[in-house]
Amino acid sequence: MLALRCGSRWLGLLSVPRSVPLRLPAARACSKGSGDPSSSSSSGNPLVYLDVDANGKPLGRVVLELKADVVPKTAENFRALCTGEKGFGYKGSTFHRVIPSFMCQAGDFTNHNGTGGKSIYGSRFPDENFTLKHVGPGVLSMANAGPNTNGSQFFICTIKTDWLDGKHVVFGHVKEGMDVVKKIESFGSKSGRTSKKIVITDCGQLS
């Protein structure tokens, strides 16, 4: 089963194991630096979008810059899954796991529950690098089931999550629509179960 980790412990996608405290680390202020995916933008980096609704009601659009200048393989995977050019991708999939004051997770377009998904390179692909860090809200990072198990599942942070540095590959950040991410977050719970069905109704590439 795919999972996020908190330190050396797994945070299961469908439920939080008893060994994991329900209280997550408090939000911390972030400082701009070389590991911040939003600290500098390259004109060559792709901009993609996710249009999201909750129980059929539009929430808005999230625009993401993919850091192809730092993690080109990971960025290309996400870009192609947004456009659907490989014949599969994120359109119609859900944000299946949302934990307030932590993150919003999506990308399982096969099983829609956190147990599936696949990359454009096959089932899984290796961690590219850990240059970019989980510095604060809006960071875009890959979910995994351990080292070198990247597929299609991803998460958008709503706080600084530096305990995930070196364990999950950061590959982008929110350029526009953080208010939409906060709306998604509002439908989450400590267990990750959402109170409404949150669907990526459309997605693609802007530039």
UniProtKB/Swiss-Prot annotation:
Membership in a protein family: Belongs to the cyclophilin-type PPIase family.
* Task of the protein: PPIase that catalyzes the cis-trans isomerization of proline imidic peptide bonds in oligopeptides and may therefore assist protein folding. Involved in regulation of the mitochondrial permeability transition pore (mPTP). It is proposed that its association with the mPTP is masking a binding site for inhibiting inorganic phosphate (Pi) and promotes the open probability of the mPTP leading to apoptosis or necrosis; the requirement of the PPIase activity for this function is debated. In cooperation with mitochondrial p53/TP53 is involved in activating oxidative stress-induced necrosis.
Q: Where is the transit peptide?
A: 1-29
The chain positions of domain PPIase cyclophilin-type read: 49-205
Q: What biological process terms from GO does the record include?
A: apoptotic mitochondrial changes; cellular response to arsenic-containing substance; cellular response to calcium ion; cellular response to hydrogen peroxide; mitochondrial depolarization; mitochondrial outer membrane permeabilization involved in programmed cell death; necroptotic process; negative regulation of apoptotic process
* Quaternary assembly: Associates with the mitochondrial membrane ATP synthase F(1)F(0) ATP synthase; the association is increased by inorganic phosphate (Pi) and decreased by cyclosporin A (CsA). Interacts with ATP5F1B; ATP5PD and ATP5PO. Interacts with SLC25A3; the interaction is impaired by CsA. Interacts with BCL2; the interaction is impaired by CsA. Interacts with TP53; the association implicates preferentially tetrameric TP53, is induced by oxidative stress and is impaired by CsA. Interacts with C1QBP. Interacts with MCUR1.
Query: Where are the N6-succinyllysine modifications?
Result: K67, K86, K175, K190
Give the modified residues of type S-nitrosocysteine: C203
| InterPro entries found in the cross-reference section | Cyclophilin-like_dom_sf (IPR029000), Cyclophilin-type_PPIase_CS (IPR020892), Cyclophilin-type_PPIase_dom (IPR002130)
- Which PROSITE patterns does the UniProt entry name for this protein? CSA_PPIASE_1, CSA_PPIASE_2
UniProt keywords, alphabetically: Acetylation, Apoptosis, Isomerase, Mitochondrion, Necrosis, Rotamase, S-nitrosylation, Transit peptide
- Sites where N6-acetyllysine occurs are at K67, K167
Question: Can you supply one Gene Ontology CC term for this chain's record?
Answer: mitochondrial matrix
CDD domains associated with the record: cyclophilin_ABH_like (cd01926)
Q: What is the activity regulation entry?
A: Inhibited by cyclosporin A (CsA). Is displaced by CsA from the mPTP leading to a lower open probability of the mPTP.
What Pfam families does the database record attribute to this sequence?
Pro_isomerase
Q: Which gene encodes it?
A: PPIF
This protein's source sits in the domain of life called Eukaryota
- One MF term from GO for this chain? cyclosporin A binding
Q: What is the effect of changing C203S?
A: Blocks Ca(2+)-induced mPTP opening and reduces hydrogen peroxide-induced cell death
EC number, UniProt record: 5.2.1.8
Question: Mind telling me how this protein is modified after translation?
Answer: Acetylated at Lys-167; deacetylated at Lys-167 by SIRT3.
Q: What class of enzyme is it?
A: isomerase
Q: What is the lineage of its organism?
A: Eukaryota, Metazoa, Chordata, Craniata, Vertebrata
This one is known as: Peptidyl-prolyl cis-trans isomerase F, mitochondrial
The catalytic activity, as recorded, is: [protein]-peptidylproline (omega=180) = [protein]-peptidylproline (omega=0)
Q: Where in the cell is it found?
A: Mitochondrion matrix
